[in-house]
A protein has these predicted regions:
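Aromatic-lined substrate-binding rim segments of carbohydrate-active enzymes
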Residues: 65-139, 272-286
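C-terminal beta-sandwich/jelly-roll accessory domains of carbohydrate-active enzymes
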Residues: 458-468, 484-568
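Polysaccharide-binding and catalytic clefts of secreted carbohydrate-active enzymes
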Residues: 142-318
């Protein structure tokens, strides 16, 4: 009997070992990782480009409504969806949490092979405290509001309320704890946006009694230590402001930063950053997903802080946020302005990778996605309102008639399809620094990029038969001494040698094609009229040009593979 028991035990142990070997190990938690020249979002062990879209603020409050949205989202070729979760949706009664909605959103995303980024609408959404639970709204004594210079309170929780901070943190950590339990092994959720466009609207700073007392106290030493240690890398306008007041290493907010509304804005940025840092740390202790904020950008009509949310992580105060909230991984811009190239440059910094959680989804949005990812090593792009993508349709010139009613034909859908094909190539090039991009308009019709052994001249497309398009865009990847992959729409491209040797570049071979599972599949060979930009050979030769280059039309974006040669 003893031998029989030992034999059975051995068999059971062997079966258990075999079974455990067949269970796949849980994928690593999504995280940010510095790889060469880029900081990238790593998902399932590989760099991930978030070809994303954000739903309307309350779309995600109804699973029934989302059932109508998921199929549309899939047709636009997204791989990631940003969805809001309101504090009041999950904690309607204090201490009683209901994550049914969260589980339903996870299930919906998984059924459609999508990943999620949750947006925690807690203490603040668009500057206001409109998503806090009713029991918070009703108890102003326990959860005090900010006050304006006119003496009136606003529907904005004070950043200095410990009760508000603790209540929001408890709910947020319960949410993160639930995500860890519900998503371990699946990794559907990639990142968390903490709050939404924080900042005080209506005044440059909180004028409540606790806030006035805090403003009169000295600037916290940890902020001044950060500014001193990072002085060479500070945003130029912030450094100028600090130095204009004497670059003091101690003093009150007005003594250190001057008597202006900008000092008020810096004060508010510090208070918001400390509040969110506390929450982010607590959430990461439960489940360490990357965390980012989003910024309501200063609009052309805005004059002073308070016209826009004062304290929001604008370019001027991002350094304040880096000092006050080290647990926040990214300060991201919501770019609802048409000069995307300017704003992406302001937010992409060595300590701040570019992610755009809100912007346009039309043709301009397609160009934004290419430019942010290609020029600024962006980890993703996300237009707002993806649950209703019909309004992103491209119109025929001079009409209100869509070019196509099919969601798959939207400019963003086409752009995302190409970016998805090229993701392994792009993320590798981001790390190597062998990638660039162009975002062109009739006002900014050309961009030159030094890449590899050539300067790549990218112009908005011009020909005799058609008007100049309003917008053109391209991504260029160098893959060898004389070899490039280019994807774009409504652009034309010349290559100019910038290394010793023959001074004129010719096209050895050009082909269209596509990537399938990371492998290039050539299509047709391109030559003749499809590459000639200048038939006047004397004029071209005088400029050290062959007169031939790459041409991308309005049917794009498309991908071309080019090999060059040089001659005297």
């Amino acid at each position: 009997m003893r031998h029989r028991i030992a034999f059975i035990s051995t068999i059971v142990f062997a079966l258990a070992v075999t079974a455990s070997a067949q269970i796949p190990a849980a994928a690593p938690i999504p995280h940010l990782e510095k790889r060469g020249a880029a900081t990238q979002l790593i998902v399932d062990g590989k760099p991930w480009l978030a070809l994303a879209g954000e739903t309307d603020n309350t779309a995600s409050s109804s699973l029934e409504y989302m059932e109508t949205a998921w199929p549309k989202i899939v047709k636009v070729n997204l791989n990631t969806v940003l969805v809001g979760i309101g504090w009041d949706w999950v904690e309607p009664e204090e201490g009683k949490y209901d994550f049914t909605l969260v589980d339903g959103l996870l299930d919906g995303a998984r059924k459609h092979n999508l990943r999620l980024i949750f947006l925690w609408f807690g203490s603040w959404k668009n500057g206001l405290s409109s998503f806090v639970p009713e029991w918070v709204k009703a108890d102003q004594q326990r959860f005090p509001r900010a006050r304006l210079k006119i003496g009136k309170p606003v529907e904005v929780l004070s950043t200095l309320s410990e009760a508000s901070l603790n209540a929001d943190t408890r709910a947020y950590t319960a949410f993160m704890r639930h995500l860890k339990e519900a998503d371990t092994g699946r990794r559907t959720v990639l990142m968390i946006q903490l709050q939404n466009e924080v900042g005080l609207i209506g005044d440059s700073r909180d004028r409540s009694a606790p806030a006035e007392a805090a403003f009169a106290r000295p600037v916290p030493p940890e902020l001044l230590d950060y500014l001193q240690k990072n002085k060479p890398a500070l945003w130029p306008d912030l450094l100028k402001l600090w130095e204009a007041a004497g670059a003091r290493t101690a003093g009150t907010w007005q003594e250190v930063f001057g008597k202006s509304t900008v000092a008020d804005e810096i004060f508010m940025a510090w208070n918001y950053s400390r509040y969110l840092d506390h929450m982010a740390k607590a959430g990461k202790a439960e489940y360490p997903l990357p965390v980012f904020t989003n910024t309501w950008l200063v609009q052309p009509q805005d004059q002073v802080p308070g016209d826009y949310p004062s304290g929001c992580p604008e370019p001027l105060v991002i350094d304040i946020w880096k000092a006050g909230a080290p647990a926040i991984d990214i300060n991201a811009p919501d770019v609802h302005l048409r000069n995307f190239n300017d704003w992406s440059e302001r937010f992409h910094r060595p300590n701040n990778p570019l992610f755009v959680p809100e912007s346009y989804g039309d043709l301009g949005g397609a160009a934004n996605a290419f430019y942010g990812i290609g020029q600024h090593a962006g980890i993703g792009y996300s237009p707002f309102g993806v649950n209703s993508p019909e309004h992103w349709a491209e119109m025929r010139p001079g009409t209100n008639t869509p070019v196509s009613n099919a969601l798959e034909d939207l400019p963003l859908a086409k752009a995302y399809a190409v970016l998805a094909q090229m993701t392994p190539l792009i993320t590798d090039a981001q790390a190597k620094g062998t990638i660039g991009a162009a975002w062109l308009t009739t006002q900014q019709p050309r961009r030159d990029i030094a890449l590899g052994n050539y300067v790549v001249n990218i112009d908005i497309q011009r020909n005799r038969r058609n008007p100049v398009p309003a917008l053109g865009y391209a991504i260029v990847v160098s893959v060898g001494p004389d070899e490039y992959f280019v994807a774009g729409r409504d652009v034309q491209i010349l290559f100019m040698p910038n290394t010793p040797g023959p001074e004129i570049a010719g096209l050895a071979r050009v082909e269209t094609g596509k990537f399938v599972d990371g492998k290039w599949i050539p299509g047709r060979r391109v030559n003749g009229d499809d590459v000639v930009l200048e038939y006047d050979q004397a004029a071209a030769a005088a400029k050290n040009q062959s007169g031939s280059g790459l041409i991308f039309g309005a049917d794009g974006p498309t991908i071309q593979h080019v090999k060059l040669y040089r001659y005297h």
